[in-house]
Regions:
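Conserved pre-ATP/AMP-binding loop-to-beta segment of ANL
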Residues: 1-13, 45-52
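Conserved AMP-binding A3 loop
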Residues: 9-36
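Conserved S/T- and glycine-rich ATP-binding loop of Class I adenylate-forming
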Residues: 14-17, 54, 69, 110, ...
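AMP-binding/adenylate-forming
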Residues: 26-41, 53-119, 159
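Gly/Ser/Thr-rich phosphate-binding loop
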Residues: 122-180
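Conserved ATP/PPi-binding loop(s) of AMP-dependent carboxylate-activating enzymes
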Residues: 189, 199-230, 250, 260-262
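AMP-binding/adenylate-forming catalytic core of the ANL superfamily
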Residues: 207, 231, 236-325
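Conserved C-terminal "lid"/linker of ANL adenylate-forming enzymes
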Residues: 288, 300-304, 316-361
Length: 361
């Protein structure tokens, strides 16, 4: 507590996708700046921020759930929290929203993660709900290509975006018209943001709303500033600027297999696209690295299914892949799912794999 800066603010937990976790200190002023930049973006696409109804299905303890409420507070807009149970029952969700006083009158804006979008798209009432929205910000994880194609076919106003706890949420967003025209990625930086790439391809961000510092869960007494001497923060995400922002995956998630650098997150997206094209009943795929005496590291695939026949089809689908990108093991894991924020808790599933190996030893 003594290390916290003076003045009002919040301490918000970040991380989880690569096994790490830390808490970031964000002054209230930084959250205000973030809300102002997002309002500027909305105005640029013809939406009056003050007129919006912000629907929020994300936890308030995370920046992705905190910021819709904070934006509404700054803009004088409406805010409605959506309980987790509603997001899993699209018929009840649609009925609930139809009962809101401003539903159908004010432009409804929703923040989602890809997992939530997929669940809604799988149900007619979920599709009906999504089609009533003015704007759908989608972030927290990569948007799989099949999901994007499905949203475009339904003419859903998706706005893929990128941000983090460290940046007080959104720093780049793709307008819905460009998304519907087929443009990939997360669009251009917001008005108060600069983006660049480090020599190794890592995305770096400079903005006046970067967190003042953070603590790691395993070193709570150590305060870590985020900025370098020139004000840049290294995100740890592999990216391209072409010119819009394209996120390839976590640099710290890359593995080295047989002399090749492999990004499991990219391969997971390819696998899910192949699974959808083949109409295979798989809820998710997660690739984990294990040590290998010959290759250095090899991939093990956890597959969200209970059908052994699916594994045979997956092996056949990936047979043409380069050896470094091809999993050496395929394991059924019916309970496989990301967190409520759509992020993979890879350390949790590594522990699951260790327990499985120990039981089979």
């Amino acid at each position: 507590i003594a290390q916290l800066p003076p003045g009002p603010g919040v301490v918000v937990r970040s991380g989880g996708s690569s096994g790490g976790s830390r808490c970031c200190a964000q002054p209230s002023l930084h959250l205000d700046r973030s809300a102002a930049a997002t309002a500027h973006w909305l105005t640029g696409i013809g939406v009056d921020p003050a007129s919006t109804l912000l629907l929020n299905p994300l936890p308030l303890a995370h920046v992705s759930g905190l910021m819709p409420w904070w934006r509404a507070r700054c803009w004088g807009a409406g805010h409605q929290q959506l309980e987790p149970g509603l997001m899993k029952t699209p018929a009840e969700l649609l009925a609930f929203c139809q009962g809101l006083p401003t539903w159908g009158k004010n432009p409804a804006v929703l923040s989602l993660v890809p997992t939530q979008l997929a669940r809604l798209l799988a149900h007619p009432d979920g599709v009906a709900f999504l089609q009533r929205l003015q704007l759908i910000w989608i972030g927290g994880a990569a948007l799989p290509a099949p999901l994007a194609d499905q949203a475009r076919a339904l003419q859903l106003p998706l706005a893929p975006c990128y941000g983090s706890t460290e940046t007080a949420a959104m720093v780049a967003a793709l307008p819905p018209d460009r998304f519907l025209a087929g443009e990939p990625g997360c669009g251009d930086p917001l008005v108060d943001v600069e983006l660049r790439l480090a020599a190794d391809g890592a995305l770096e961000v400079r903005t006046d709303r970067l967190a003042l510092g953070c603590w790691r869960a395993d070193q709570p007494e150590r305060w870590e500033p985020l900025r370098d001497g020139d004000g840049w923060w290294r995100s740890g995400d592999q990216a391209a600027l072409t010119p819009g922002l394209q996120i390839a995956g976590r640099i710290d998630g890359a593995i080295h297999s047989g002399g090749e650098t492999v990004f499991p997150e990219q391969l997971e997206q390819r696998l899910m696209a192949a699974l959808q094209a083949a109409s295979l009943p798989v809820s998710a795929v997660l690739l984990l690295a294990v040590d290998d005496p010959e290759w250095g590291q090899r991939l093990v695939a956890l597959v969200g299914s209970s059908d052994p026949a699916v594994l045979q089809r997956l092996e056949a689908l990936t047979r043409p892949w380069p050896p470094a990108e091809t999993p050496r093991r395929w394991l059924l894991c019916p309970d496989l799912a990301p967190s409520a924020l759509g992020k993979w808790q890879r350390q949790r599933w590594r522990e699951w794999l260790k327990r499985l190996d120990a039981a089979e030893a």
